[in-house]
């Protein structure tokens, strides 16, 4: 599929389907749209009246045009209130149009959308992202894939002449999102610690990044007892992934993105029981997937920022070698941890990853993880939790989320709650009381960052959706990739 800007006037464009964005309660056709309606014998006005179209956000209607016309179908999509127009409004509207056009077997699709904030580059990027994200399909594990039907071949963005770079940026970012989607969606017998390490090596080879894969023996030498405690039960070896992107010249900043990479979480000896959703625990490496997806995108975009992509990857399994409830692990910064729940393993892997990252001399660290069910209880399935003691980093992340349209909410870091993590025989326990569980998880991670500005994103909810939601189909969403890329690009401005 080719997405391209077009300087073709609306009244002269020809193709299979033409999509027009209209604001809520402003669907009266005027100016160029009125002329277009006359050209098509009043079919637009008739369609709006018959369907009682009001322009509500993401609502769509379409009609076929009489044979012999330059356009076969007209699609109207609602954009909501004009004063509420956001980039994500355009992204979601474009996704809705793309699905309609594909269902109608359109090969050539045109968009006539208004600008967000008089910014053609950002608007073109959002529309292109919406189309590409919505049309993604994962059929790798189908023995007889369903008929995909007619595919959209060309998308023209009318009125966006000169915005090739914005569309290219959208392509680069979406390539990272789709990599993350593929990794999260794949079962644990397809994506293992070995697989993720190989994926990192492939990204490095394809895009010129530096890569280092630390094996178990390397991690032992670095004293990564927390990470290795999680990994010790599995027959598969742990892999500590470190990808590095370095720009030409002196970087403006040095950043790290750390992703939780538990490729399957059985819960360990505190095994996940019936009704726990254990069959979904292939997605417990969603943070690592987003990290690798961001690496793929950033390697193509080439910002003036040095970025380290890190993940301590392992399975949390059950065997005669498994860590026991009550075991004491020593992390690589010397902190001792009483494991009172083997199913709170992600924070143990992140602990050593954070210590490792801080030694790189960074300006900021962001980790993201499918860390707690408590965050899902607090914020639901669509919103990630943002935990940080640093207001500047919080503002950067929130700004990036506004651009990407990925929902996030800053949560408190109530230091008093750390009392619940205190241990009688070690420096801390790995879990505290049930109330405030997402906060105590973030406070646990905070013990492994000394001075570097740091933020933790709990993405347990939005990493997956059970049904179609905007530009995400049912399944893995690739949450975090676009947010992280926008964070890095914002730092590099």
UniProtKB/Swiss-Prot annotation:
Kindly give the PROSITE patterns that the UniProt entry links to this protein: CYTOSOL_AP
Question: Where do the annotations place Mn(2+) 1 binding?
Answer: 265, 343, 345
Q: What is an example of a GO molecular function annotated in this UniProt entry?
A: metalloaminopeptidase activity
The parts of the chain that form a coiled coil are: none
Cofactor binding note of this UniProt entry: Binds 2 manganese ions per subunit.
Q: Which cofactor does it need?
A: Mn(2+)
> What PANTHER family would the database entry show?
CYTOSOL AMINOPEPTIDASE, LEUCINE AMINOPEPTIDASE-RELATED
Name of the protein in its database record: Probable cytosol aminopeptidase
State the species of origin: Nostoc punctiforme (strain ATCC 29133 / PCC 73102)
């Amino acid at each position: 599929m080719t997405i391209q800007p077009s300087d073709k006037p609306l009244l002269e464009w020809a193709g299979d389907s033409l999509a027009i964005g209209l604001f809520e309660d402003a669907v009266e056709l005027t100016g160029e749209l009125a002329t277009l309606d006359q050209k098509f014998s009043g079919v637009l006005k008739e369609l709006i009246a018959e369907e009682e179209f009001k322009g509500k956000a993401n609502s769509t209607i379409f009609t076929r045009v009489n044979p012999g016309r330059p356009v076969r179908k007209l699609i109207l999509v609602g954009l909501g209130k004009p004063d509420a127009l956001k980039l994500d409004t355009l992204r979601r509207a474009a996704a809705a149009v793309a699905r309609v056009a594909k269902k109608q077997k359109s090969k050539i699709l045109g968009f006539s959308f208004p600008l967000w904030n008089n910014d053609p580059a950002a608007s073109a990027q959002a529309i292109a992202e919406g189309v590409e994200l919505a049309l993604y399909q994962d059929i790798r594990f189908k023995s007889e894939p369903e008929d995909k039907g007619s595919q959209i071949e060309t998308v023209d963005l009318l009125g966006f002449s000169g915005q090739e770079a914005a569309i290219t940026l959208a392509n680069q970012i979406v390539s990272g999102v789709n990599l993350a989607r593929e990794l999260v969606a794949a079962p644990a017998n397809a994506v293992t610690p070995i697989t993720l390490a190989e994926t990192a090596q492939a990204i490095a080879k394809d895009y010129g990044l530096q890569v280092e894969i630390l094996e178990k023996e390397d991690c032992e030498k670095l004293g990564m007892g927390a990470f290795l405690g999680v990994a010790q039960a599995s027959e598969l070896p742990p892999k500590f992934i470190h990808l590095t992107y370095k720009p030409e010249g002196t970087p403006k900043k040095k950043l790290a993105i750390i992703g939780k990479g538990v490729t399957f979480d059985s819960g360990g000896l505190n095994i996940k029981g019936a009704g726990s959703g254990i069959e979904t625990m292939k997605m417990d490496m969603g943070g690592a997937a987003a990290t690798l997806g961001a690496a793929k995108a950033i390697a193509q975009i080439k910002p003036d920022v040095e970025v380290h992509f890190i993940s301590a990857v392992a399975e949390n399994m059950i065997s005669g070698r498994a860590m026991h409830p009550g075991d004491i692990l020593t992390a690589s910064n010397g902190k001792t941890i009483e494991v009172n729940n083997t199913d709170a393993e992600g924070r143990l892997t992140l602990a050593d990853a954070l210590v490792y990252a801080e030694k790189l001399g960074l300006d900021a660290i962001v980790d993201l993880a499918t860390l707690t069910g408590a965050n899902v209880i607090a914020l639901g399935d669509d919103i990630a939790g943002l935990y940080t003691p640093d207001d500047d980093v919080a503002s950067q992340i929130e700004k990036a989320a506004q651009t990407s349209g990925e929902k996030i909410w800053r949560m408190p870091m109530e230091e008093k709650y750390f009392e619940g993590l205190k241990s009688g025989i070690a420096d801390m326990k790995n879990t505290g009381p049930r109330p405030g569980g997402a906060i105590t998880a973030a406070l646990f991670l905070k013990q492994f960052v000394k001075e570097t500005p740091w933020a933790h994103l709990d993405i347990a909810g939005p990493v997956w959706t059970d049904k179609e939601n905007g530009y995400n189909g049912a399944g893995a969403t690739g949450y975090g990739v676009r947010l992280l890329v926008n964070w890095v690009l914002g730092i590099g401005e």
